[in-house]
Amino acid sequence: NDVAVLTVDPPIVYSAAISPVCLPPFNNAADQFVGKDGAVMGWGRLESGGVQPNALRQATVQIIPNADCNAQYGVGTIFKQQLCASAPGKDTCQGDDGGPIVVQAKADSTAWTQIGISSFGIGCANPDFAGVYASVAFFRKWIDTYMKN
């Protein structure tokens, strides 16, 4: 399910350039972020089978209903612990798996909420298949359990 919890020692020192990302509350509803714009970022390939960039890349994609994503991949492929996002010519690619998809916490806020973790897709920016992400909200109880340990 692409979820890991890491302990960092020594603790990270936050600054104007380094800040934490918010996590959404637990919610097992699949479509709670549908229609929102999400930012994906990573060091993955620039196109399927292509080269990796020299700088961190970012793209904006839109969260789509899981029913639409299931229609693309085949019924029973996408589950409530996943969410999907797409935009013309934009996507995550090989090397981006495990990276974030974040949404602005509020329209005029500088805070971001990580709603998903890049999981898989068919090709990169394939117009017939959205990118698939593990839902952070679905796994929030599991994340909280391991963060307490």
Where are these regions (language model features)?
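Extracellular "complement/coagulation-type" protease architecture
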Residues: 1-149
